[in-house]
A protein has these predicted regions:
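HhH-family (HhH-GPD) DNA N-glycosylase catalytic core used in base-excision repair
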Residues: 1-198
């Protein structure tokens, strides 16, 4: 068995083997992926992975409460930071999305509860055999995109939403020929022990 064909070099291999497709229910990590997927628009995911640590540092560990308070000085600082994608619209979107994220979390109790409602709270287990079979968007990502945009989120088109769903384990899009497919299908959530409780 071989890993998914897009994971041929670092940092993609480590990301594929340790994170991609593992269900995420931690609000901060969901917010991180929301921002990173939006930053990736028009770029390769490899580019974003290589800048991920820089993003964490530049965006205060992806703490939405802090980012939501960013002002003009922070925007200027971020535009001058070569370690991230220095796109004014994407930076403004990250700040605006932090504010909207907090509003959604207040309404639903957690961002996790809101986001996972688009897949009825459990991962969709796909059984793709070829990368050509994996869709770029689905009815669920279309619905997520519409609702996120209605609430004021930016850089959340359906293709970005589907990438977010893949990254956070809302869908298991590892090919069935990849050993991670079976591993991920048995994982409950990122960071949770798989041991049974007595």
């Amino acid at each position: 068995m071989e890993r998914c064909p897009w994971a041929t070099a670092e940092p993609n291999i480590t990301y594929h083997d340790e994170e991609w497709g593992v269900p995420v229910h931690d609000d901060r990590l969901l917010f991180e992926f929301l921002i990173l997927e939006g930053a990736q628009a028009g770029l390769s995911w490899t580019t974003i992975l290589k800048k991920r640590d820089n993003y964490r540092e530049a965006f205060d560990g992806f703490r939405p409460e802090k980012i939501a308070r960013y002002g003009a000085r922070d925007v200027k600082r971020l535009l001058g930071d070569a370690g991230i994608v220095r796109n004014r619209l994407k930076i403004a979107a990250a700040i605006g999305n932090a504010r909207t994220f907090l509003a959604v979390r207040k309404e639903f109790g957690t961002f996790d509860a809101y986001l996972w409602s688009f897949v009825a709270g459990k991962p969709i287990q796909n059984r793709w055999r070829r990368m050509a079979d994996v869709p770029a968007r689905t009815a669920q990502s279309d619905a997520m995109s519409r609702d996120l945009r209605r609430r004021g989120f930016k850089f959340v088109g359906s293709t970005i939403c589907y990438a977010l769903m893949q990254a956070t384990g809302m869908v298991n899009d590892h090919l069935v020929t990849c050993p991670r497919h079976a591993e991920v299908s048995g994982v409950r959530r990122a960071g949770e022990s798989s041991r049974r409780k007595n």
